């Protein structure tokens, strides 16, 4: 995080602190109006998700990469490489310091159970969200996969169209994508 925060055009934002007192880190870059959020390791045992995030950060901060330059010009990108530093440090597989599965807290996060999600949601409320990717991993699946938003009451047809479009693009662009 410190190395990336020192890159030109990257801002470090401390979103808050965890129950163990660790920083909830966010890296922000880009100058566009489209608000893009990438976040990983709500489940700390999914270390591959952070590896993916490291690759995404490396790509997005590469001044020689024309796609990254275009994205930074069109978007404001917010990256939380590790949503659950307490769980990561403690060696937990799915929970934070008090045993909360952060992935289940988004509807009603609290400072006592899920300050990590609360801090991220507060920042999302400030910036807005046009695209969000919650990066997970499964050591038993040797491919990239995405899961949709089935069952979310506020889901719109426009969001569904965007999701389907993204899935088609991902399928065309990477042989590692599992459909």
PLM regions and their residue ranges:
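Active-site/substrate-binding loop(s) of hydrolase catalytic cores
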Residues: 9-25, 31-176
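Non-catalytic propeptide/linker segments at domain boundaries
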Residues: 1-11
């Amino acid at each position: 995080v410190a190395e990336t925060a020192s890159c030109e055009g990257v801002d470090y934002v401390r979103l808050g602190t965890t129950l163990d007192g660790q920083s909830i880190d966010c890296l922000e870059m880009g100058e566009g109006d489209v608000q893009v959020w990438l976040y990983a390791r709500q489940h700390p045992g999914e270390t591959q998700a952070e590896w993916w995030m490291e690759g995404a950060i490396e790509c997005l901060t590469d001044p020689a990469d024309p796609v990254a330059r275009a994205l930074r010009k069109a978007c404001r990108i917010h990256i939380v490489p590790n949503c659950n530093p307490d769980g990561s440090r403690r060696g937990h597989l799915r929970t934070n310091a008090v045993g909360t599965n952060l992935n289940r807290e988004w509807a009603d996060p609290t400072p006592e159970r899920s300050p990590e999600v609360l801090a991220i949601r507060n920042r999302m409320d400030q910036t807005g969200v046009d695209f969000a990717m919650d990066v997970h991993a499964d050591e038993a699946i040797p491919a990239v996969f995405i899961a949709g938003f089935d069952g979310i009451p506020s889901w719109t047809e426009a969001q569904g169209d965007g999701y389907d479009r993204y899935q088609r693009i991902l399928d065309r662009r990477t042989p590692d994508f599992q459909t």
